[in-house]
Amino acid sequence: MRGVFYMFVAAVSLALFSGQAYAQRYLPGMMGVELRGGFAGGSKGPLNYYTGMAMSGYTKKANRWVAGAEYLLKNYNYRNVAVLRAQFTAEGGYYLKFLSDPSKTLFLSIGGSALIGYETVNWGDRMMHDGSRLLAGDAFLYGGALTLELETYITDRVVLLANIRERALWGGSLGVFTTQFGLGLKIIIH
């Protein structure tokens, strides 16, 4: 019995402390599903957040394309009442990998995306509680985003994402630029 225990300990030690083999990552044709979310416009209010879902595919030279949808909710204060701006956007973009570690566990990418969507202010209700009327209304949006993203492989099929993003959307009535800080999870499906 003691001999079996020592052989088990030796096998585990060899498995843990010998060189590791990593699965191939960032191969052309690999695809993943992303779930992401975070803070929008800083973390000034509890209602300033975004969430989204995307599909990404890897190309030659370890770059990738992204197509997805996002929901952003931002809070504006008016006389101690929240006026909400909600944006529903679709995204199509391309990310260039410019840094990775030798073990292919960490990847840093920069990307640009085209965005199109719809914005609603105070869910279409233009009359405020005190009788004043909102000048900002619902509108269609168009623009783009610049993203810096860090990908960390937790396993060969599960990836943790961290990103900083600046969105510029025209057509709305409440400002053009929105900064986002977020985390995400990507599942490699192919």
Where are these regions (language model features)?
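Polar/charged side chains located within well-ordered beta-strands of beta-rich proteins
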Residues: 35-37, 63-67, 92-96, 149, ...
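Gram-negative (and chloroplast) outer-membrane scaffold detector with strong preference
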Residues: 54-129, 187-190
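Extracellular loop and loop/strand-boundary signature of outer-membrane beta-barrel proteins
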Residues: 38-41, 76-83, 130-136, 168-172
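Predominantly the C-terminal beta-signal and adjacent terminal strand-loop region
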Residues: 72-74, 144-190
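Short glycine/proline- and aromatic-enriched beta-strand/turn motifs that initiate or cap beta-hairpins
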Residues: 21-74, 182, 186-190
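Residues that define the transmembrane beta-barrel architecture of outer-membrane proteins
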Residues: 29-31, 45-51, 82-90, 106, ...
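Cleavable N-terminal export/targeting peptides
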Residues: 1-28
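Outer-envelope beta-barrel architecture signal
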Residues: 24-33, 61-65, 104-110, 140, ...
